[in-house]
Amino acid sequence: GLLQTITEKLKEFAGGLVTGVQS
């Protein structure tokens, strides 16, 4: 559903932020 899609996008976004901070 739409909520699941949004959740997945938020996970990807958060993962990108974490990777950016760590590098």
Curated annotation (Swiss-Prot):
One of the record's GO cellular component terms: extracellular region
Cysteines engaged in disulfide bonds, as pairs: none
UniProt keyword list: Amphibian defense peptide, Secreted
Known tissue expression: Expressed by the skin dorsal glands.
Location(s) in or outside the cell: Secreted
UniProt record, GO biological process: defense response
The keyword Secreted appears for this protein: yes
Molecular functions (GO terms): oxidoreductase activity, acting on paired donors, with incorporation or reduction of molecular oxygen, reduced pteridine as one donor, and incorporation of one atom of oxygen
InterPro entries given in the database record: Aromatic-AA_hydroxylase_C (IPR019774)
Family: Belongs to the frog skin active peptide (FSAP) family. Aurein subfamily.
Function: Has no antimicrobial or anticancer activity.
Protein name: Aurein-4.3
Organism annotation: Ranoidea aurea
